[in-house]
Amino acid sequence: MSKKRLHEIAKEIGKSSKEVVEHAKYLGLDVKSHASSVEEADAKKIISSFSKASKPDVTASQTVKPKEVAQPSVTVVKETGSEHAEKTQVSKPKSRNFKAEREARAKEQAARKQANGSSHRSQERRGGYRQPNNHQTNEQGDKRITHRSQGDTNDKRIERKASNVSPRHDNHQLVGDRNRSFAKENHKNGRFTNQKKQGRQEPQSKSPKIDFKARAAALKAEQNAEYSRQSETRFRAQQEAKRLAELARQEAKEAALKAQAEEMSHREAALKSIEEAETKLKSSNISAKSTADNRRKKQARPEKNRELTHHSQEGQKKNKKSWNSQNQVRNQKNSNWNKNKKTKKGKNVKNTNTAPKPVTERKFHELPKEFEYTEGMTVAEIAKRIKREPAEIVKKLFMMGVMATQNQSLDGDTIELLMVDYGIEAKAKVEVDDADIERFFEDENYLNPENIVERAPVVTIMGHVDHGKTTLLDTLRNSRVATGEAGGITQHIGAYQIEEAGKKITFLDTPGHAAFTSMRARGASVTDITILIVAADDGVMPQTIEAINHSKAAGVPIIVAINKIDKPGANPERVIAELAEYGIISTAWGGDSEFVEISAKFNKNIDELLETVLLVAEVEELKADPTVRAIGTVIEARLDKGKGAIATLLVQQGTLHVQDPIVVGNTFGRVRAMVNDLGRRVKSAEPSTPVSITGLNETPMAGDHFAVYADEKAARAAGEERSKRALLKQRQNTQRVSLDNLFDTLKAGEIKTVNVIIKADVQGSVEALAASLVKIDVEGVRVNVVHSAVGAINESDVTLAEASNAVIIGFNVRPTPQARQQADTDDVEIRLHSIIYKVIEEVEEAMKGKLDPVYQEKILGEAIIRETFKVSKVGTIGGFMVINGKVTRDSSVRVIRDSVVIFDGKLASLKHYKDDVKEVGNAQEGGLMIENFNDLKVDDTIEAYIMEEIVRK
């Protein structure tokens, strides 16, 4: 029998795949996902169950009425067997009455027990309810029912012949027809195995026919009702427990607040009593002081008179007054003057004789329940927030052992201890970093749950070289992308959208795995689905394995497209088996990866591939909120001579509009213009839509996140702050020499470097080229990327190259005329390329040229000293004979005596007899003299050699 997949059934009946999978599991079928296959009978069962679910349930209503009027006698059935009675029995009640059904079943069982006895009931139970674990009992019950039905059929034939009544109007025949239909239905469901027993009837004279389907449905409904009652009881118990727990928490909180209020009232009463005592003490001191002043005033004039009389009697001492007397006179005079001034002019002069004014009481402010603080708050700021005097807080801090003034900053721990002493709950204020745009991607509260809608999937196509990735992309674009402007020319911006079955799919055109890896390193997970292309004739290749690892690291589902099935050597089964070794298992083998056999060249099964993409996207349930401010990721960036920085963005959440203030990576700006993948200007971009924008002040990096801010001022502040942080981080990465890394620094000083400046057309090419050059492995030499940027080669690049002794590499760009002229003047080398492999080879050759030459020793020959001659003012001359090879004039020699090297040096002269020669061959004799060595002896061995340079590979 043929099989069907669940998503095909869902498409046929117009239901979602998720509903069909759940319904199949409910029917007891062993399925795992939308790709699981079922038999044709099971498929019909699923379709019929969906059609029954959409229609009113007539079966359950039919089973209630007949059971209430069922009688064991056959004659009663004949009396009540009219067509009108049948119609009334089939009519559907308005509502189910489970109590009435249970009473009807009880009456039916009692009647059956009286008529047939317990044996019939046991047989009926065994025949009516199939027990899966007891097949033998079911077969025996079926045989008994068949024998009874055969006898009853013979009786009815005799009755029909005698009465000449048509079997169509016979009530017994109606019951038989029902039994036959019921037996056929049971045969379809696999309940009876003997085909001869299907058309036979159960005798109505002994027991009425039982509608097993109706009874099963009724029991199922009753079980569901009981389960719902239990669930409701359990839910109510949980709600009651929650309510009691909440009530207990509220009571505990109220008790704590009450205790705190009582403590505060006691503290306030104590403070009030202290203030009253201080007020009384001050008033008593003031009254005592005023009394003493009045007493001194009364005694002041007599003292003056006595003093004046005393001085007048002394003669010469008349004009000499003591210092105390002068002060007394002056004070008295001043007091009288003030007194007269007050009485004459009515000035409000303080009178010491009046009673003191009452001290004004300070207005009492309640302490706050919570206090939100920031690190570094001063005592004065805290006092103002909690409405207390700074002196009071300083006093409390002093009692806690902290010496502080009202302008001194406090740390968080001290502030918390101070608030605990006041009985206030202290909370640190959470500082929101406006420059951190990553928080929008991590904060779940950023989205509105009621506004979330379905979005288009983002698909990345990966695979080995020459496996058809580019061909598939071209096929999809040419066949599915709508024509653009004049001539159907479209602008390629690194990402594009196609439409299939009324739904959009976004494809990312990320050439090579380097860009994908760099985006993963920065955490830019923008891909929802990966299409892995494998050639049917090549199978799994190294880059295929690399693509599998990248997709698993990204955590995205994989759809395998087996390409080139039109070739003669295609073997899709081998590809499936090889991918299974790396954890990519087909759904046909019980895995979770979809496999589609396609031919991108001949446009074969492309529709099936797109349907699979939409199916996987439906299972993944990709959602987005288009109402919030837009956030997303940079796909590509480049520098245009006329437009400036151009960035290709993929909107992931929210909607991006023209004139929105935006922060992209470490740069900022305002969206000046927005162009879609067809080269048309648009005013807004919804989630999963790729657009190209202008208006940024600098070129961002591929893989950076972007976010829209409320106003341009906030965006500018966030962008400048992010730029400062990036610069500070770059400076912190500079390694300084210490004792720990001294050896590594000295070792690194021995390594030669090749300085390069990289300029390319797009940011992705800059990153890929820089990463490829750094990975070049040449022992003793490394590449140092001095500067890398997007755009043409200008004068500043030439100046930097001259200062750092670097080579400028231009990838798909050209130098300006001024830069070329300056490079010729400053003797700066500029290399222009359009193929990355050529750049790598050229830089590798330059690195090898930086290395010092490596030499290898080559032995030329050996000679034996036969005689020595000592010549004055010249030295020792050795007569030799060559025993192996040759001895040349420009070779170096070693003097070996008793297998020990005595001397190693150059030849001073080489002669054959009396003639100077360039070399002496094998078995020839000659004379030689060695520079700076005269200790030659007979039987010394002379070894001649030269040093040859080794070519590096």
Curated annotation (Swiss-Prot):
Region described as G3: 509-512
Residue numbers spanned by region G5: 599-601
Statement: the UniProt record of this protein carries the keyword Nucleotide-binding: yes
Compositional bias of kind Basic and acidic residues: 80-89, 98-111, 140-188, 229-248, 300-317
Chain residue ranges for the region called Disordered: 48-248, 279-363
Residues in tr-type G domain copies: 454-623
Biased composition, class Polar residues, residue ranges: 191-207, 282-291
Segments for region (G4): 563-566
Localisation: Cytoplasm
Domain of life of the organism encoding this protein: Bacteria
PROSITE patterns to which the protein is assigned, alphabetical: G_TR_2, IF2
Biased composition (Low complexity): 322-338
Listed GO CC annotations: cytosol
Pfam family, one: IF2_N
Flavoprotein as UniProt keyword: no
UniProt-annotated binding residues for GTP: 463-470, 509-513, 563-566
GO molecular function per UniProt: GTP binding; GTPase activity; translation initiation factor activity
Bias (Basic residues) ranges: 339-348
G1: annotated segments: 463-470
Chain segments carrying region G2: 488-492
InterPro entries referenced in this protein's UniProt entry, alphabetically: EF-G-like_DII, IF2_II, IF2_N, P-loop_NTPase, Small_GTP-bd, T_Tr_GTP-bd_dom, TF_IF2_bacterial-like, TIF_IF2
Similarity section: Belongs to the TRAFAC class translation factor GTPase superfamily. Classic translation factor GTPase family. IF-2 subfamily.
Function: One of the essential components for the initiation of protein synthesis. Protects formylmethionyl-tRNA from spontaneous hydrolysis and promotes its binding to the 30S ribosomal subunits. Also involved in the hydrolysis of GTP during the formation of the 70S ribosomal complex.
Protein name: Translation initiation factor IF-2
Source species of the chain: Streptococcus pyogenes serotype M18 (strain MGAS8232)
Gene: infB
